[in-house]
């Protein structure tokens, strides 16, 4: 079985459009086979965005890690006027994100990166709905690795379900970050982590 965090060049392409509404704004995104949550914006991403936007409304420099087809970055640009770099290990996801950037006349940037391998900048916020199925080592690389790409008072925002180890992962990050649970609904936990 193929996962959305791998690249399968031979996977058939069936690009389609999905609609998403948040804060009375409507978005239409291109999606395709082989990307995360291709049929609709998943609940975790939706809750992460709503919680973030309830807490932060200013224009910031943001990195969206594991951007999928670009939902988080494009919504944040539209709602907060933030400048967002969007990265993914899945080349099809990066291609779709670039299509959605063009469609929405966005100034955001999307590029391939294995975790932070191609990231050269620092950010006010790093935000992610991380790929849980990559395993603990890669997941911790994404979450702990964010620290060196955060500005001095930067924040890492992420979502993990409680039954997927959200609280266990939080404990593993407590040497690196001061972490606060900003919201919890339907088993999903929204975390905001600030560097110690």
Regions inferred by a protein language model and the residue ranges of each:
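Conserved beta-strand signature within the Rossmann-like core of class I S-adenosyl-L-methionine
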Residues: 153-161
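N-terminal auxiliary segments of SAM/dcSAM-dependent transferases
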Residues: 1-23, 34-37
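Core SAM-dependent methyltransferase catalytic element
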Residues: 183-196
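A short glycine-rich, Lys/Arg-flanked "PGG" loop and its adjoining helix->strand segment in the class I
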Residues: 140-152
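Conserved SAM-binding loop and adjacent beta-strand
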Residues: 32-50
